[in-house]
Amino acid sequence: MKNAAILAILITMTFISCCSYAQQGSGRKILIVYLSRTGNTKAIAEIIHRNTGGRLLALELVQPYPDNYQATVQQVVKENETGYLPPLKTKVDSMQQYAIVFVGFPTWGMQLPPPVKSFLTAYDLSGKTVIPFNTNAGYGVGSSFDAVSALCKNSKVLKGFSLQGGVERDGKMLVIKDEQQAAAEVKVKKWLQETGLAANR
C-alpha cells in the first residue's frame, strides 16, 4: 500500500512537471516578420512558419516602392545615402508579447533594406531573441546581418539563414517553388534545429 502511494505521488509529480514544460513551450510566442518583393523571402518565411508556428507578418510601406525595378533601385540608393527610413504601413500591437522575432529580407545593394531598418528602429526588441533570414541574387547577405546585430544591440541575435533566390534584374522572380522549395525546406529545417528552434511536430 505504501509503495503504491509513493508511486502515485511520483506519477502525479511527473505529470505536473510535463504539463508545466508544455505550457512554457506553448507560451513562447514567435513573430515572423518579412519583406519580400519577388516572393522568395516570403517562401522562406512560410517554411519557417510551418515549422515553428507563431505569427506571420509581411512588412508593407505607407508608400510602396515602384513596380519598375530600376526606379526602386535608384530610390533605395538615395534612402541608404540619406539614412531615410520609409514609414511602415504594417503595425505590430503589443510587441512585448513576443519572445522570438524572425526578421526576413532580400539583399538590396549588398545592404539591409530600408524598410527592415524602419522596423528594427521602430520597435524595442531588447531582451528578445532575433533571428535574421535572407534571400539574395547570388551575391550573399552583404552587410545585412551585421546591420541587424547593430540595430539589435540589446537582443540575442542568433545565426542567420541565407539562400539564393531570384534575380529581378534579369526577370527571374519567384524561384523558390516546386523542387527548389522542397530543397529549401530541408535546409531551413536543418538551420532551425541548429538554432534550437525547430518545433517537435
Q: At which residue positions do the language-model features occur?
A:
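FMN-binding flavodoxin-like domain, especially the glycine-rich phosphate-binding loop
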Residues: 11-31, 35-60, 81-105, 109-201
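Bacterial N-terminal signal peptides that target proteins for export
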Residues: 1-8
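Charged, often glycine-rich, active-site loop that binds/positions anionic groups
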Residues: 67-81
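Short active-site-proximal "capping" loops at secondary-structure junctions
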Residues: 61-65
